[in-house]
């Protein structure tokens, strides 16, 4: 199944050409890494795929039946939000089922409780809360009631990474996971865990990283932007 088709993409900033006339396809199950020198347009290319930037010419066609999920360097959250609230703000049926089930535990409405239980069954969401805690634990995020505002930059990145991994877990439809430098702010143990997690995961992946060992372990396809070509 084809996820993304790119044809003859060119991007310039002023008089500087980042890349020109590049073409590629991403298919289901691909685990692809993009490598290049700094300033060669790796992150710009990801932003174009996500619709956050625009090419000067060329086409990007994204399969309408897939979900594209991005981990980048910009993390947005609401002021006062706890880690749990940030993670559980995901808009997906399994997460909605879990939110309703947790509300039902403090409700006197027996009909609401019964419906919440049925939702959990239908969405196969019973293991979701434990999996969420396990992923956060592996990334050394333990106080789930901590306010996002009070976290360090590195902690915020790790919480956002956890949210992304949980999102790919709960989305039942076809998902492309795009990751820009995911090992930043991770210690050796966390990098090793993430490497194993992504290697085992049945996910389609497009990855940018300077960690050559990590990308060699996780990805089976490596693309290089060199002399403005892919």
Protein language model features and the residues they cover:
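ABC ATP-binding cassette signature C-motif
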Residues: 1-230
């Amino acid at each position: 199944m084809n996820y993304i088709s790119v044809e003859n993409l060119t991007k310039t900033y002023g008089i500087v050409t980042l890349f020109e006339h590049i073409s590629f396809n991403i298919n289901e199950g691909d685990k692809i890494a993009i490598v290049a020198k700094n300033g060669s347009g790796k992150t710009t290319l990801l932003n174009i795929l996500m619709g956050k930037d625009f090419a000067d010419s060329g086409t990007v066609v994204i399969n309408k039946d897939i979900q594209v999920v991005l981990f980048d360097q910009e993390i947005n959250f609401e002021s006062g939000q706890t880690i749990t609230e940030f993670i559980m703000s995901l808009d997906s049926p399994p997460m909605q089922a879990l939110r309703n089930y947790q509300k039902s535990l403090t409700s006197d409405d027996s009909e609401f409780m019964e419906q919440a239980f049925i939702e959990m069954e239908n969405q196969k969401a019973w293991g979701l809360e434990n999996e969420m805690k396990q992923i956060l634990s592996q990334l050394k995020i333990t106080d789930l009631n901590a306010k996002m505002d009070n976290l360090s930059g590195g902690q915020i990145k790790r919480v956002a990474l956890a949210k992304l991994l949980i999102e790919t877990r709960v989305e039942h439809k076809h998902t492309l996971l795009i990751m820009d430098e995911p090992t930043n702010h991770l210690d050796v143990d966390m990098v090793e865990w993430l490497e194993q997690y992504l290697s085992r995961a049945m996910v389609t992946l497009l990855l940018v990283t300077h960690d050559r060992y990590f990308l060699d372990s996780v990805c089976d396809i490596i693309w290089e932007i060199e002399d403005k070509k892919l």
